[in-house]
Amino acid sequence: MKSFYHYLMKYRHPKPKDEISHFANAAYEDHSFPKASTDYHELSVYLELNGDYLSSMTTFDEAFEQYDVEVKKK
């Protein structure tokens, strides 16, 4: 199964147009991001402690919900 990080990278953009693209660009630069994780709780805890680049955890929640629908439910 594709990790959340791998899924999120499809939203990277040199000129981000939305919060998820900003999140994807920042996660790419975050060398400690749990790149192999598919677990909401693990990612959420990591971002609450280290995700100062997120303007709101709602951005993560929305991205993870899309990931859950598109990848995990297949």
From Swiss-Prot:
UniProt xrefs under InterPro entries: UPF0346 (IPR010673), YozE_SAM-like (IPR023089), YozE_SAM-like_sf (IPR036806)
Pfam families on file: YozE_SAM_like
Disulfide bonds: none
Signal sequence residues: none
Transmembrane regions: none
SUPFAM superfamilies tied to this protein: YozE-like (SSF140652)
Taxonomy, superkingdom: Bacteria
Coiled coil: none
Family: Belongs to the UPF0346 family.
Database matches in NCBIfam families: PRK13672.1
Annotated HAMAP family: UPF0346 (MF_01538)
Protein name in the entry: UPF0346 protein BPUM_1890
Organism encoding this protein: Bacillus pumilus (strain SAFR-032)
